[in-house]
Amino acid sequence: MLVSDFHFDLPDELIARYPTEERTASRLLHLNGETGHFEDKQFFDLLDQINEGDLLIFNNTRVIPARLYGRKASGGKLEILVERVLDEHRCLAHVRASKAPKEGAELVLGEDKLGEGNGFKAIMTARHDALFELHFNEEQPLFDLLQQAGHMPLPPYIDRPDEDADQERYQTVYSKVLGAVAAPTAGLHFDNPTLEKLKAKGVNIAFVTLHVGAGTFQPVRVDNILDHKMHAEYAEVSQAVVDQILATKATGKRVIAVGTTSVRSIESAAQAAEKEGKLITPFFSDTSIFLYPGKTFRIVDALVTNFHLPESTLIMLVSAFAGYRNTMKAYQHAVEAKYRFFSYGDAMFINKNPNALNDLP
């Protein structure tokens, strides 16, 4: 199975660089995975697709202002993107600079927001492949420093500086647990009134946590997808969520994941449970689960997701869920119908294809 099997041509003008004025004002492409039929709708029509007793699972991770600008104490500008906070004073980060800092190098960060001479210092203590371990020599916890001096880490394809409005719009309204460096974007379409309408309809709601890493934007750099090494992200699926999933399955209702990160969290927990002969168990660990055509989904029955990059692991996940041909036809239609793509773009609602295992490139 080749990466090129998941290519499609995307005009640059279809990349959404700003969100819609209202969260629910996006368009929605409904793809029935079983029949392959798709239909153009508006996002607020999603309410008609979700039934009483269904379980809607969201990812409640909260994006940290993870991008910092600064300089080496010895001179030379640099840009830092925090990938993972290790504790109150240490993190792993990507560093962009004309010359990579060496171990022991002192960095001065945040002066663009705090003023010249008011930045804070960090020491590069170790390198782990592409990531640098940084130690911040400040009394304040790292999360506080990022809130003061960090920028929202907009994805590279948005291709503009972050603005004040992104502080709100690049977060879901239910985000709670700090730790992501990218938003779980399917959730950006939901506002509080929509959540209240779902509850009033008798739809059950649950939250998992997966801290989305910058690896989600990394291109697949191999020809055969089986050679791809998936990045790891930390995920949590609590006992309470497991109980809700089991109760939903017992009544014959659907488990609906909001976003690929929710899918990966739930299916990671199911994969771990399989070794114990169970359907699903609580999960608190890193996951590098890679779902591509030929892989099975043990729990998730339907999916809300945005439109993803060509040749990305996310379009591979959608193809595994909806069927390869269904997915590529739906994407071709989305391009022709001028849907808006990627993080600030439009959404899909997909019913699982029970025959997806047989629909390979």
Curated annotation (Swiss-Prot):
GO terms for biological process: queuosine biosynthetic process; tRNA wobble guanine modification. Pfam families: Queuosine_synth. One of its GO terms (cellular component) is cytoplasm. It is found in: Cytoplasm. Keywords: Cytoplasm, Queuosine biosynthesis, S-adenosyl-L-methionine, Transferase. GO terms for molecular function: S-adenosylmethionine:tRNA ribosyltransferase-isomerase activity. Pathway: tRNA modification; tRNA-queuosine biosynthesis. Its EC number is 2.4.99.17. Its main location: cytoplasm. It comes from the Bacteria. It catalyses: 7-aminomethyl-7-carbaguanosine(34) in tRNA + S-adenosyl-L-methionine = epoxyqueuosine(34) in tRNA + adenine + L-methionine + 2 H(+). HAMAP family: QueA (MF_00113). Monomer. PANTHER family: S-ADENOSYLMETHIONINE:TRNA RIBOSYLTRANSFERASE-ISOMERASE. Belongs to the QueA family. Transfers and isomerizes the ribose moiety from AdoMet to the 7-aminomethyl group of 7-deazaguanine (preQ1-tRNA) to give epoxyqueuosine (oQ-tRNA). This is S-adenosylmethionine:tRNA ribosyltransferase-isomerase.
